[in-house]
Regions:
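Short, solvent-exposed alpha-helical surface patches in non-cytosolic proteins
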Residues: 176-243
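Basic/polar, cationic surfaces and motifs that engage anionic cell-wall
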Residues: 2-9, 18-20, 94-180
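Extracytoplasmic/secreted proteins, especially bacterial periplasmic and envelope-associated proteins
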Residues: 50-52, 104, 108-115, 164, ...
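Extracytoplasmic/periplasmic, Sec-exported soluble proteins
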Residues: 18-20, 47, 76, 80, ...
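Sec-exported extracytoplasmic/periplasmic mature domains
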Residues: 68, 114-122, 170, 174, ...
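N-terminal catalytic cores of peptidoglycan-degrading enzymes
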Residues: 1-82, 153, 157
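Cell-envelope and extracellular/periplasmic
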Residues: 32, 81-96, 114, 147
Length: 243
């Protein structure tokens, strides 16, 4: 289990426990004030507070880690939620309703949540705004503090943007997944790419990586990414490889 490479500050809190559940949930919180990531870390460093989060985001867009991902933070007033969730505290530019955050903090939040989902195998971020779906991560894998305690957290500003957050994170995950797609045989390719790749294979331009072949005797280890395939097709269509 890894931690986010996006952090620029680490101040590990003693207020945490061993995680016993796989990470499959995201819980976004608000700091209820415009605290820096250093100030938030100092608060969580106090054992008497018995509170922490995995990450924190300041109004300047910087990201800190307070509890490593392999540990459960004490953040959401619910140990079962925190055992499966990555918790993120976001600074507020106004310490009252609707508890807004800066553009820089919101942009950093999108980056961080995308990274967390990608590294932990969360294929899609799901939000219905339905408390009854807590724990049903195939239907909803975002939760909020207000569902577990009498609090406004994460504030209406962020709460009302959970659907937007999910949509943008999913858009980014789709792009990342497509970039990671690899094709080893001509049969696996999308139809629009098969003529070009077949031509290049038959011409000996593409030979595969290790000598494996498919039923037609063509390479079965082409190891072509989506981007590589698109580039080859573009080159073919403008005549670089001849007719």
């Amino acid at each position: 289990m890894s931690n986010s490479p996006l952090i620029c500050h680490t101040h590990l809190s003693p207020n945490c426990s061993r995680r016993t559940h796989a990470i499959d949930t995201i819980t976004i919180h608000c700091m209820a004030g415009d605290a820096s990531i250093e100030a938030c870390g100092n608060l969580f460093a106090d054992p008497a507070r018995r509170a922490s989060s995995n990450y924190g985001i300041g109004s300047d867009g910087r990201i800190a880690m307070y509890v490593e991902e392999n540990c459960r933070s004490w953040c959401s007033s619910n140990s079962e939620n925190d055992d499966r969730a990555i918790t993120i505290e976001v600074a507020n530019t106004q310490a009252s309703h609707p508890w807004p955050c800066s553009d820089a903090a919101f942009a950093a939040l999108l980056d961080l949540v995308t990274d967390i989902c990608w590294r932990n195998g969360i294929k899609r971020l799901l939000w219905c705004g339905d408390k009854s779906l807590i724990g049903q991560v195939d239907k909803q894998n975002m939760t909020v503090h207000r569902w577990f305690d009498n609090k406004a957290c994460p504030g209406d500003f962020l709460y009302q943007r959970h659907g937007q957050i999910a949509a943008e994170v999913n858009r980014r995950l789709t792009i990342m997944e497509e970039a990671m797609n690899t094709y080893n045989t001509i049969e696996e390719l999308p139809d629009w790419a098969k003529p070009t790749i077949t031509k290049l294979v038959d011409a000996g331009v593409l030979k595969g990586r290790g000598g494996a072949v498919d039923g037609s005797g063509r390479p079965a280890d082409l190891d072509l990414t989506e981007d590589m395939v698109r580039l080859l097709v573009i080159h073919d269509r403008i005549g670089i490889y001849g007719r």
